[in-house]
Amino acid sequence: MGPSSPTSPRRSAKPRPPPGNAMPTPVVAPSLLAADHGDFAAGIRTIEEAGLGWVHLDIMDGHFVPNISFGPQVVAALRPRTRLHFDVHLMLSHPERFVAAFAQAGAERLTVHVEADHDVAKTLAAIKDAGLRAGIAMNPDTDPRRLLPYLDSVDLALCMTVFPGFGGQAFIPTVLDSIRFLAAERTRRGGDFRLEVDGGVNAETGLLCRAAGADTLVAGTAFYKAPDRRAFVAGLTA
C-alpha cells in the first residue's frame, strides 16, 4: 500500500450504530484475520449468525508489523454486505495517511498504535474530524502510561495481548497488569472509553481479561474454530 488514498465505493448498506460505552455485558468482536481469506464474506456471515454486532479488521502494512493483510479496498467491498460495526485496527507505520481512505471505505472506528511513526494527537483528531470513533493501541511490552495523554480524547483503548502481526499466538498474561492499570485510570477519570484486548483470546483468557477490566474482546482463532460459536460467545458474556 502506498501513501496515497484510493477512491473507494460508497457504502450501500447503512451500518449498525456501535453499541454504547456503558454496556452491562462485554462486546465480542471476532477478527476477520482468522477467517478464510478466500471468502471473507462467509467470515462476515459467520459473525452475524453468532448474533454479534462487531467485526474486528486488522490492517497490516509489512512495516510496522511483519505481515501484510488487506487495505481499504477490501473494507469497501465488505461494507455493502453487512451492517456489522467495523472496528478497524491500523497496524501501520504512518496511519494518518490512510484515515480518509478507511473512512470512505466504511469504517466506524479506527484504532492506531502509540508506537507508530506519527503524531498521535493529530492522527486521533483527524479520525474524529472524519466522523469516526478513535482508538489508541499499545503493544504487550509498552508501558501503559504512554496512553495517558490520549485517554480523554479516545473512545477505545486497546491492549495487545500478543505481539501484533499474526493470528493464533499464545496469550501474554503479563498484559493483564496493563489492563488493570487502564481500567483503574478510566475509573479515576470517570471516563467511558471502551477497553479492548486483542490476541490469544479464548474461553479462559477472555474471562481473565474481563476480570481485569476489559469490556471488548477480540477473538479470532478461538471463535472461528469453536464447535458452537454462540456458546463460545455466551461463555464470554455471561
Indicate where each model-derived feature is located.
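NAD(P)-dependent Rossmann-like dehydrogenase/reductase catalytic/cofactor-binding core
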Residues: 2-22
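Hydrophobic faces of well-ordered beta-strands that scaffold small-molecule active sites
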Residues: 26-32, 55-57, 78, 86-90, ...
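Active-site beta-loop-alpha junctions enriched in small/polar residues
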Residues: 31-35, 60-62, 91-95, 115-117, ...
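Conserved anion-binding
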Residues: 36-39, 81, 97-101, 105-194
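Conserved, mostly hydrophobic/aromatic
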Residues: 40, 47, 58, 102, ...
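A structural motif
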Residues: 49-54, 107, 154, 214
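Glycine-rich, proline-tolerant flexible connector loops at the mouths of alpha/beta enzymes
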Residues: 55-72, 162-170
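C-terminal helical cap(s) of enzyme catalytic domains, especially alpha/beta-barrels
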Residues: 127, 210, 224-238
